[in-house]
């Protein structure tokens, strides 16, 4: 039975209440810890899951316990995951990276905004009630300077961002001493180079080689540094954004916070409705994770939704607007070339990418080459001045498994490889977007093609969905493909929610999509053999075998759902210490029986050992003391 549908007014009121009452919140039996680095201000947040001790013997009156180590885990929630930090959405988050940016001395504050659209929005007092109050004074690179993490990496500079990432990627596993927890199966990495310990130098080296990116616009100092690359943990992106028919600024900020709570490593704001500029400002000032956008969406709004009326000038103005707000990466559909559009004519589902279809329509209506391709070097110059990473969009991705791996898809991919090399000339960081809808047996080719033709730049895919028959469950159909392509080397997975193909996701849909994709990403890390990836699994298995129910809930990706499902049948507190669950009951619990078998085997070993000693004693004549030569 579905919950009662809220009205638009009720949805906005609920979101406003969420924002007004927002506090830093820890997961059950978890606490926020910080690991400090060697460079000033490097203080890396993690979540530490506290575990209960294991009963190892003794009596009912005097039981003996063995402590279980706390499990440190990667935490994307930023200040929202720390109960000690006061949260005020009206003021935004603390500017963590500002001292690092200022110390480099290669940026300058802008007295006047570069975007005409931004100037007009700021001058219009009718937007005062919607506007974020504490507007950041934007910066850009000084003349002749480049301020990208790729530029620094190529210069041999280890930035504070790189040290922060190295500590974060190691996930505090050096704190774990138990051999049981540290045990890990060998992985199959398909050529990925996974160091036993991630250092700041290894981060720098991967970024310098173009195999990884650090999305970190100088105008988004609130963000906590993270990295996207196949030699690091697989990351997950969540999409949010309003549309012309639904959602509000309050709801999008709520979805942002909610996304970071459930593990979004980055968030894309795909707003297409009114107040795109104002919504994005609220999101950026309150986001501890990198924010991506598809600038063509807003550029289209500026020409009243008529693709044919798009111009390079309007698009350039949009890039400047968003770069100075702090957007960390742009999806640019520069690979949709005029000559590729006819290749899609025989497809079952044509061009399904919104950005791809916009550019295809523009190309056909003007019979000119894609202006994003034509002006790509100018795009790179803008990105280099603010350290905006490029996510080269797959505008010709397949929208059905019938269209997977076709001529149009791979023609565009090869062009994205050419554009990657151009971006690198400007020290601009690049990742490549991928499909889409691909059956399982055809997924790996997408990864091998990308590595070969895009020079090992990080791959970022939407799924892929492995079947087309499950609307309402496409987080499952795509999670299968996401786990596979993550294993093969994909660096970041864009989540798919249950609402895919059906409607705009709400808060619960966002959670469901993220949990599904955190599972897929983690499964890929395990399969690749990422160092330390198995620690949490081992801790869960140990807690499960020892019937430490509270620890099982708390180690779960979603502790609340795990507890709810358990309590549906065993709600009493006694159920939290019972050596069985409702699936098998007390008589048929396999783990309880296994424990009994283990105890019996141990007892048998003792009895056999005693019998052997007795026989040996008799064989030696039954003497308590033996002569020295007999001993």
Swiss-Prot record:
Gene coding for it: thiC
GO biological process, one term: thiamine diphosphate biosynthetic process
Iron-sulfur is among the record's keywords: yes
Cofactor(s) this protein cannot do without: [4Fe-4S] cluster
Name of the featured protein: Phosphomethylpyrimidine synthase
Species per Swiss-Prot/TrEMBL record: Shigella dysenteriae serotype 1 (strain Sd197)
One term of GO molecular function: carbon-carbon lyase activity
PANTHER family named in the record: PHOSPHOMETHYLPYRIMIDINE SYNTHASE, CHLOROPLASTIC (PTHR30557:SF1), THIAMINE BIOSYNTHESIS PROTEIN THIC (PTHR30557)
Its EC number(s): 4.1.99.17
């Amino acid at each position: 039975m579905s919950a009662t549908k809220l009205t638009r007014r009720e949805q906005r009121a609920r979101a406003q209440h969420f924002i007004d009452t927002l506090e830093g919140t820890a997961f059950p039996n978890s606490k926020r810890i910080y690991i400090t680095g060697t460079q000033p201000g490097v203080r890396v947040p993690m979540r530490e899951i506290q575990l209960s001790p294991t009963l190892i013997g003794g009596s009912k009156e005097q039981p003996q316990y063995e402590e279980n180590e706390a499990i440190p885990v990667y935490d994307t929630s930023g200040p929202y995951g720390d109960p000690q930090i006061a949260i005020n959405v009206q003021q935004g988050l603390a500017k963590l990276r500002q001292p690092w940016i200022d110390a480099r001395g290669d940026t300058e504050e802008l007295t006047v905004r570069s975007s005409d659209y931004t100037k007009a929005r700021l001058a219009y007092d009718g937007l005062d009630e919607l506007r974020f109050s504490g507007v950041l004074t934007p910066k850009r690179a000084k003349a002749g300077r480049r301020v990208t993490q790729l530029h620094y990496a190529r210069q041999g500079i280890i930035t504070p961002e790189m040290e922060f990432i190295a500590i974060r990627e190691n996930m505090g596993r050096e704190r774990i001493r138990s051999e049981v927890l540290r045990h890990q199966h060998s992985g199959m990495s398909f050529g990925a180079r996974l160091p036993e310990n991630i250092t700041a130098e290894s981060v720098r080296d991967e970024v310098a080689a173009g195999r990884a990116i650090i999305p970190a616009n100088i105008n988004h100092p609130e963000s906590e540094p993270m990295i996207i690359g196949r030699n690091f943990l697989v990351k997950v992106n969540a999409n949010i954004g309003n549309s012309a028919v639904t959602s509000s600024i309050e709801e999008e900020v709520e979805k942002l916070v909610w996304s970071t709570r459930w593990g979004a490593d980055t968030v894309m704001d795909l707003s297409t409705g009114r107040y795109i500029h104002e919504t994005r400002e609220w999101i950026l000032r309150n986001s501890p994770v990198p924010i991506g956008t598809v600038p063509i969406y807003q550029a289209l709004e500026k020409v009243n939704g008529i693709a044919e009326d798009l111009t390079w000038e309007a698009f350039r103005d949009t890039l400047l607007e968003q770069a100075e707000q702090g957007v960390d990466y742009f999806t640019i559909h520069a690979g949709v070339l005029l000559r590729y559009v006819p290749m899609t004519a025989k497809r079952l589902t044509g061009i399904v990418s919104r950005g791809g279809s916009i550019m295809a329509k523009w190309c056909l209506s003007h019979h000119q080459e894609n202006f994003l391709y034509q002006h790509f070097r100018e795009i790179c110059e803008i990105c280099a001045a603010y350290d905006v990473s490029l996510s080269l969009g797959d505008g010709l991705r397949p929208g059905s498994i019938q269209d997977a791996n076709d001529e149009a898809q791979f023609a565009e991919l090869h062009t994205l490889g050419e554009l990657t090399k151009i971006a690198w000339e400007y020290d601009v960081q690049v990742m490549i977007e991928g499909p889409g809808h691909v059956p399982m047996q055809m997924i790996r080719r997408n990864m091998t093609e990308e590595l070969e033709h895009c020079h090992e730049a990080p791959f970022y895919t939407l799924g892929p969905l492995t079947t087309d028959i499950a609307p309402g469950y496409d987080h499952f159909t795509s999670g299968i493909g996401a786990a596979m392509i993550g294993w093969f080397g994909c660096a970041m997975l864009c989540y798919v929610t249950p609402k895919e193909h059906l409607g705009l996701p709400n808060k619960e849909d966002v959670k469901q999509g993220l949990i599904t994709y955190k599972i897929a990403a983690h499964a890929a890390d395990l399969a690749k053999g990422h160092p330390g990836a198995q620690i949490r699994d081992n801790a869960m298995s140990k807690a499960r075998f020892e019937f430490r129910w509270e620890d099982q809930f708390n180690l779960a990706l979603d502790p609340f759902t795990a507890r709810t499902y358990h309590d549906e049948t065993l709600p009493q507190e006694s159920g939290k210490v019972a050596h069985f669950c409702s699936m098998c009951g007390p008589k048929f619990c396999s783990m309880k029986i296994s424990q009994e078998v283990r105890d019996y085997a141990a007892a048998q070993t003792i009895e056999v050992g005693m019998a052997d000693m007795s026989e040996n004693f008799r064989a030696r004549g039954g003497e308590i003391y033996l002569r020295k030569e007999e001993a």
